[in-house]
Amino acid sequence: MPQLNPHQTFANYIEGESNKLSRSVGLSIAEHPNTNQFNPMFIYGPSGCGKTHLVNAIGVQTKQLYPQKRVLYISAHLFQVQFVNAVLKNATNDFIKFYQTIDMLIVDDVQTWASADKTQETFFHIFNHLFRNGKRIILASDRPHVELNEMSDRLITRFSCGIIAELEKPNVQLCVDILNAKIRRDGLKIPAEVTQFIAETANGSVRDLEGVINSLMAYSVVYNSDIDMRLAERVIKRAVKVDDTPLTVDDILEKVSNHFKVSVSAVSSKSRKRDLVVPRQVSMYLAQKYTKMPAARIGRLVGNRDHSTVIHSCTQVENRLKI
């Protein structure tokens, strides 16, 4: 059975503008798990923004304050594997009963349940039992609940009945703070200019930040050299996929408009002319795929459209690609 990571706590979860709300709500839940406020908590954000650390911190803090509580962290994938094994062993009822005894259930990466209808149905019943009995449910996903296209509507409704908290990629200043915390914790000596350089080139991924520091430590020991800009540049090239010019929705609109020989203003207009519908849909599809921006925000930037229009456009393009 998976366990909480005791090293991922609130003490080493560095706060910034991108995670302030989520961290505050998570800490409140850990300190007051017996209230039904903010239940369930649905956290979403791109890979590497700190979701797993945050949900672990909630669980660890809860166990420290309430040792008698049964707190379980599990990935959605492992939950699904366990469920399939239970079905094969004709032990589905035992599987469900076990999860119904949990006081705080933390499920990570729930987006992996897309199209897994039986898993969704089983979790729906577990969710209802826990919720009715005042138990805590915390869910993490790489996208908003409204963009879990192949999730059942009734489960989506359950996900949204508590609090929805977005975790954005950390900005440069938060990356610097995270790096400095790790540097102090590991007893390293790294010049401020190197720290700033890493923060600016690691694409806002906490995993990348930690990976770069670990690599710097290894290189420094193996080659018996100080950690300086030269070494940092060498490590960055190997450890991080550097994106010098992040793609924006404006970039995509410009490229798509040029390809289809129409103007950006026309693509972003309210016009429903056929020669504008396709470039508009392609723009939305590429924006969702390459900017990791929520559908609602993409819609606002492409003619002030709602998230359902963006999702429909992406589906249309995906269907064409399959032909």
Segments (PLM) and residue ranges:
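Short regulatory helix/loop adjacent to the ATP-binding pocket of P-loop NTPases
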Residues: V84-L88, H145-C161
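Dynamic helix-loop-helix/coil hinge segments at AAA+ ATPase domain boundaries and subdomain interfaces
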Residues: P2-L21
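Walker A/P-loop nucleotide-binding motif
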Residues: N34-N56
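Conserved AAA+ ATPase "SRH/arginine-finger" region at the nucleotide-binding site
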Residues: E147-N149, G162-L174
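Terminal-proximal interaction/regulatory segments of ATP-powered molecular machines
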Residues: A266-I323
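Short glycine-rich substrate-engagement loop in P-loop NTPases that contacts/grips substrate
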Residues: K63, Q68-M104, D117
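C-terminal helical "lid" of AAA+/P-loop NTPase domains
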Residues: N180-R184, T195-T201, R207-V222, L231
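Phosphate-binding P-loop
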Residues: P2, I29-F38
